[in-house]
């Protein structure tokens, strides 16, 4: 029984699915997808639970969310292992994901009050008050790269605001989704407030097609995000949050400290085996001897990265990709770029056929035409050389995406110029592209998403503002508008 609907664990009536470890092929989870009728049942349960949940005092909702945080802390080792085994990422990195989930609770409580709390201004004859109200029933679509942390970034703010939810994890990480929901169950959520439906494309389409849905919070690929945007067009009554991918540029203008610049680049491009939406995909390196030395050192150090199993000792920097198919897609993207005229600096290599273990690849594409503007979700870094900083900014902005951008330089003026001209929601200076603060907004422009549906601004998508002019009693104004006569006439 792998679906949780209206407080009950039930068996899916859809396609049979099993999840294996992407490196060892060990079977980790088996279950059936939710069919369309079960998705509708989950929505009905959420709708029925909404009025009572929304009317709960905020403190009551907060108490349940904080109980969930305590359960995360108590079961940190267990959840870390589930995430690591299911995604293929090393244990150390999975542990940081669970820590981020725990930290998200206090941050979301602060964000609720800062972004969507109540404000009151006294007027001469009353008060003007701003309040926020939950949307109602929201769907949450989770990704596979951070199957605990990223859905958590929508679920927690949405529950705090008083919404009820239907959560569909990625079909590639059902085990993590189920494990997290069991902790929510133990935290004491009332029946129907949070519902779990497992499944792939058909389940997702059934969920996004529901008429009785007040909104959808999505994290995933641009192609799926665009599909959802088209599907919900003409329905302004539904809130849609899209957190999508990026084709992110990292500009190496001044690499005087070569090893520090190489370390920053490795952290930007290859952490999580390149499976972060903020990962550097395009490396822009200034022409000249310093840039040559930087690239040579980058290829040298990156070539020593050996992906390993989640529980290897010592731990590897990167583990496997989410699937062998994902690793194959990266290999095909590299070969495509070679066929276009790219010059391979470091060839990616499958460590073992049939697994998702893949070494990093680096390919130079300076002067190559018709390079696809796409997010290759894995450890493949594309290099361009440039002559001057204005050209670097032009290259950086030459994409339909706009998530993250970074600069390695000692010149503050160059960073200020980049801040003004970059088309990106995150612009870092001498910091990895993959570094982001949960106390700041997270998201991008263009094909990277709409507004900032994650991190500090996630609360904005979970409640709508209600403005009120109010007074405890009704009185006649001392001064009337022109043309109004309230004088009492003598009876004749």
From Swiss-Prot:
CDD domains referenced in this protein's UniProt entry, alphabetically: ALDH_SGSD_AstD
Pathway it works in: Amino-acid degradation; L-arginine degradation via AST pathway; L-glutamate and succinate from L-arginine: step 4/5
InterPro entries: Ald_DH/histidinol_DH, Ald_DH_C, Ald_DH_CS_CYS, Ald_DH_CS_GLU, Ald_DH_N, Aldehyde_DH_dom, SuccinylGlu_semiald_DH_AstD
Database matches in Pfam families: Aldedh
Domain of life: Bacteria
Reactions catalysed according to its record: N-succinyl-L-glutamate 5-semialdehyde + NAD(+) + H2O = N-succinyl-L-glutamate + NADH + 2 H(+)
Annotated positions binding NAD(+): 220-225
NCBIfam families membership: arg_catab_astD (TIGR03240), PRK09457.1 (NF006992)
Task performed by this protein: Catalyzes the NAD-dependent reduction of succinylglutamate semialdehyde into succinylglutamate.
Family from the record: Belongs to the aldehyde dehydrogenase family. AstD subfamily.
Protein name in the entry: N-succinylglutamate 5-semialdehyde dehydrogenase
Species this chain originates from: Salmonella typhimurium (strain LT2 / SGSC1412 / ATCC 700720)
Organism lineage string: Bacteria, Pseudomonadati, Pseudomonadota, Gammaproteobacteria, Enterobacterales
